[in-house]
């Protein structure tokens, strides 16, 4: 696909957002070099069956989100925002041979679904990072966009994560590897979060803040909900926990950010998490927004990332 940047604008700027740095994606596995073929099973791709550099070598922005339909909608939205003339029907699911994830590409933007929870996004990230490595991509920015529950903030607020924390409000991801617990850092790229926050200021009526995001292993008891099939705590215990989370700097809760931050950081990817809140967990546990309001809220992270990408590519007025 042709460059989205007009020929007259293709000289890159000399500020910190330039692509000239050639920051490649690193895999931390010496055994990959010994393999004749790498099959990315859950993506229905492979190093012998596909020309990954030709297919993905120009990727600069990767956006991941839980819902397949939402990621398809984001890809179609970016296709229009970047001014491509090809019909939307030309944007096909690259992972159509599998029912695990979906993947769409438009210009330098790759959109991929990751399902719900740490195990699902972890599998996708392993294969995505290897894909970017095999494709020899460089200077890639990866952003998770999604929905979340807020703590002490109004529904519809967009939270840009500075640090992902676990259920103990600690900036760490604990991975069980063989019979050991390995602890990894969950810090995200500070300059990227600041850049995204500055982009949000250009959008009217767009409440945004930077704060900690708590990542849990469960949607119900793990997030202190009283409405699951099981509940082993009181309303008072729930509120005490959420208030302590707020005091620790947590502004929203989801289920993927710690492993996302840890894996991207280890592999040299500049990463960010941008989630809209659908409710204030201090007030309620269930999402009861009108459908049109819910749809508009869900589009807010997409709108911010579109503005960010267009600005990076020099396409903003």
UniProtKB/Swiss-Prot annotation:
The keyword Oxidoreductase does not apply. Its EC number is 2.4.2.3. Disulfide bonds join 95-102. GO terms for biological process: CMP catabolic process; dCMP catabolic process; nucleoside metabolic process; UMP catabolic process; UMP salvage; uridine catabolic process; uridine metabolic process. InterPro entries: Nucleoside_phosphorylase_CS (IPR018016), Nucleoside_phosphorylase_d (IPR000845), Nucleoside_phosphorylase_sf (IPR035994), Uridine_phosphorylase_euk (IPR010059). GO terms for cellular component: cytosol; type III intermediate filament. Coiled coil: none annotated. Uridine binds at residues 148-149, 223-225. One of its GO terms (molecular function) is identical protein binding. Predominantly expressed in kidney. Pathway: Pyrimidine metabolism; UMP biosynthesis via salvage pathway; uracil from uridine (phosphorylase route): step 1/1. PROSITE patterns: PNP_UDP_1. Keywords: Disulfide bond, Glycosyltransferase, Redox-active center, Transferase. A conditional disulfide bridge can form within the protein that dislocates a critical phosphate-coordinating arginine Arg-100 away from the active site, disabling the enzyme. Phosphate binds at residues 66, 100, 144-147. It catalyses: uridine + phosphate = alpha-D-ribose 1-phosphate + uracil; 2'-deoxyuridine + phosphate = 2-deoxy-alpha-D-ribose 1-phosphate + uracil. Homodimer. This is Uridine phosphorylase 2. It comes from Homo sapiens (Human). The lineage of its organism: Eukaryota, Metazoa, Chordata, Craniata, Vertebrata.
């Amino acid at each position: 696909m042709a460059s989205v940047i007009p020929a007259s604008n293709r000289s890159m700027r000399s500020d910190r957002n330039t692509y000239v740095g050639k920051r490649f994606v690193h895999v931390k596995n010496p055994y990959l070099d010994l393999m004749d073929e790498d099959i990315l099973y859950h993506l229905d791709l492979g190093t012998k069956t596909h020309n990954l550099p030709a297919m993905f070598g120009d990727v600069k922005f990767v956006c991941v989100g839980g819902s397949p339909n939402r990621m398809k909608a984001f890809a179609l939205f970016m296709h229009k925002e970047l001014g491509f003339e090809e019909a939307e029907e030309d944007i096909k699911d690259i992972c159509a041979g599998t029912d695990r994830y979906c993947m769409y590409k438009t210009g330098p933007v790759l959109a991929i679904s990751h399902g719900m929870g740490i195990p699902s996004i972890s599998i996708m990230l392993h294969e995505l990072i290897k894909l970017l490595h095999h494709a020899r991509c460089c200077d890639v920015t990866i952003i998770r966009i999604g929905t979340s529950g807020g703590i002490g903030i109004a529904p519809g607020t967009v939270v840009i994560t500075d640090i992902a924390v676990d259920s103990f409000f600690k900036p760490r991801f604990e991975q069980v590897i063989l019979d050991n617990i390995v602890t990894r850092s969950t810090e995200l790229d500070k300059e990227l979060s600041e850049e995204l926050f500055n982009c949000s200021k250009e959008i009217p009526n767009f409440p945004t803040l930077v704060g900690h995001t708590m990542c849990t292993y469960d949607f119900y008891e793990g997030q202190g909900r009283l409405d699951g099939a099981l509940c082993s705590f009181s309303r008072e215990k729930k509120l005490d926990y959420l208030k302590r989370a707020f005091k620790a700097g947590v502004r929203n809760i989801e289920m993927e950010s710690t492993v996302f931050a840890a894996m991207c950081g280890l592999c040299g990817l500049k990463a960010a998490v941008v989630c809209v809140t659908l409710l204030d967990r201090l007030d309620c546990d269930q999402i009861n927004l009108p459908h049109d309001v819910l749809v508009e809220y869900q589009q807010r992270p997409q709108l911010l990332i579109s503005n960010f990408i267009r600005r990076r590519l020099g396409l903003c007025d």
